[in-house]
């Protein structure tokens, strides 16, 4: 089926400054309050609310382009459509190919023809990308402000598309450019690294949760506004799927496990290692919890992508995000727009988004999570929330919890018992379909029997998930056993010792609850 692609853009934005010559970042938008509007649920047959004259003129022109005449058609006589709204995370920033006129100099929405909305497997005649790099919720909500002179407020664009097509899915990715200021924070972190000014975690960590708490109501109101737009266009809430998609982490600390790691300068991983740990383990998870809360309170379908790029971060073997990138083709002197593509999903990242969205749409789920399990390069949708899936495992004999030593997820890290706490390095998820045990630190590290040594005394470690025999385990009561050697059990011989294989004997030291 041929799709007509219309584009726009999005924000989370530009990150990394260029060596010393920056200090700027992605940019975009301005705040704005949200108008609280509630519309009664309409049937699909209900007449739409008339648009303001200026928007109606645009709608009529677009209808003529699509159908050959300007009138608004009944839903069942329209072409089907998908639409994405939001910021740079979904506009296509970072892909490298952009639709005119969104590649400057007066419009930097950076909408890509390879953005996720254009690449799903969801059957649709038309796809629309009205997101814009740098957008915050004030550029999306009802009564908001356009980012550029040739742009509409994104909710107005939705109102037009909803009257000219039968919209099947509305995708929203927003919030990073509100209180969080993700782009400026990333820019500052990179600048501090390039200028040897010290890690940025101490600067931002104390107020990070407050930033998340501040953006949640704005995202919630934006979702409600989009519902209102659709109701005013004659849709019942059940006529389409409204998806709020969470953000993945573009960075992580395990890039040195890449056997072909070329160095940070080459792959663009400009940042302190400690900041990559904080970003993956704390900053992005806190943001994810806020987005999940916004979806739950508004009834939107939620797609948790917080672990989607695990194993595919900047500088890994198969990165789904772009590292620090300076666009030397941009006319004029280097500025924030020269680096705005940095630390955004690349074409493979958008392909991953598209796959997750396709699976989500087909599933009918109201909440789901997506990740690449076992390094296949193919995202898999799970009918669960990652926050609910990962749990501690406590040893019955010692009272210790199964722990990743020093909260380090590098290949070869020991797995041991330790005093229980709330850290992610003590949470685990057992994938019953694949029999793998994943650490809460990253979806890309699994419990591993090194070198397939299924003998007594072998110590368990973390390793890049691959789904091989030495990473498959069975649950038998409260015991965990290698699937290839079910007569041996994971055992903690004493407090704070490494977990080792021993012949199963039914003792408390082999039971984890």
Q: What function would you assign to each model-found segment?
A:
Residues 60-133, 190-191:
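Serine-esterase "nucleophile elbow" of acetyl-processing enzymes
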Residues 149-211, 249-254:
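Oxyanion-hole/transition-state-stabilizing segment in secreted/luminal serine hydrolases
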Residues 1-41:
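Secretory targeting and sorting signals
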Residues 81-93, 126-131, 168-173, 178-180, ...:
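Structural recognition of the beta-strand scaffold that forms the well-ordered cores
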Residues 381-409, 425-455, 470-496, 511-513:
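Extracellular glycan-recognition/adhesion modules and their associated mucin-like linkers
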Residues 96-108, 184-214, 257-278:
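A solvent-exposed, charged loop/short amphipathic helix patch at secondary-structure junctions
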Residues 248-367:
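Catalytic His-Asp segment of secreted/periplasmic serine-dependent ester chemistry enzymes
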Residues 32-76, 80:
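Low-complexity, acidic Ser/Thr/Pro-rich repeat tracts that form intrinsically disordered stalk/linker regions
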């Amino acid at each position: 089926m041929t799709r007509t692609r219309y584009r726009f853009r999005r924000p989370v934005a530009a990150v990394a400054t260029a060596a010393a010559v920056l200090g700027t970042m992605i940019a975009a938008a301005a705040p704005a309050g949200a108008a609280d509007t509630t519309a009664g649920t309409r049937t699909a047959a209900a007449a739409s609310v008339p648009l303001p004259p200026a928007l109606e003129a645009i709608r009529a022109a677009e209808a003529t382009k699509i159908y050959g005449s300007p009138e608004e058609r009944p839903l069942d006589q329209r072409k089907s459509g998908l639409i994405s709204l939001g910021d740079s995370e979904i506009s296509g920033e970072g892909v490298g190919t952009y639709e005119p006129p969104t590649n400057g100099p007066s419009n930097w929405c950076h909408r890509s023809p390879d953005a996720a909305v254009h690449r799903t497997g969801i059957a649709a005649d038309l796809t629309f990308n009205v997101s814009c790099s740098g957008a915050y919720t004030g550029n999306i909500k009802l009564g908001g402000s356009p980012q550029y002179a040739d742009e509409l407020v994104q909710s107005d664009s939705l109102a037009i598309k909803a009257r000219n097509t039968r919209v099947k899915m509305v995708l929203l990715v927003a919030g990073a450019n509100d209180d969080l200021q993700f782009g400026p924070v990333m820019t500052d972190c990179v600048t501090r690294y390039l200028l040897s000014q010290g890690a940025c975690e101490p600067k931002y960590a104390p107020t990070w949760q407050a930033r998340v708490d501040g953006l949640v109501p704005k995202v919630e109101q934006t979702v409600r506004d989009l519902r209102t737009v659709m109701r005013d266009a004659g849709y019942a809430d059940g006529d389409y799927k409204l998806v709020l998609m969470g953000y993945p982490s573009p960075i992580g600390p395990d890039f040195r496990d890449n056997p072909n790691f070329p160095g940070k300068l080459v792959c663009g991983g400009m940042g302190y290692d400690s900041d990559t740990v904080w970003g993956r383990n704390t900053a992005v998870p806190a943001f994810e919890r806020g987005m999940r809360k916004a979806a739950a309170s508004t009834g939107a379908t939620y797609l948790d992508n917080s672990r989607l790029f695990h194993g595919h971060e900047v500088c890994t073997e198969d990165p789904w995000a772009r590292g620090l990138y300076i666009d030397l083709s941009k006319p004029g002197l280097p500025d924030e727009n020269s680096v705005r593509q940095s630390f955004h999903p690349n074409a493979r990242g958008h392909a991953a988004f598209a796959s997750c969205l396709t699976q989500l749409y087909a599933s009918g789920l109201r909440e789901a999570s997506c990740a690449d399990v076992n390094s296949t390069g193919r995202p898999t949708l799970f009918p669960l929330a990652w926050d609910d899936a990962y749990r501690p495992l406590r040893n019955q004999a010692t009272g210790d919890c199964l722990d990743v030593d020093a909260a380090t997820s590098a290949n070869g890290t020991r797995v041991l018992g330790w005093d229980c706490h709330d850290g992610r390095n003590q949470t685990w998820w057992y994938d019953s379909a694949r029999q793998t045990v994943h650490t809460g630190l990253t979806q890309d590290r699994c419990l591993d029997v090194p070198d397939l040594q299924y003998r007594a005394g072998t110590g368990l470690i973390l390793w890049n998930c691959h789904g091989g025999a030495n990473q498959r385990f069975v649950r038998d009561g409260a015991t965990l056993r290698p699937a290839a050697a079910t007569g041996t059990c994971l055992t903690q011989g004493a407090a704070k010792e490494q977990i080792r294989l021993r012949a199963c004997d039914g003792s408390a030291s082999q039971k984890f609850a």
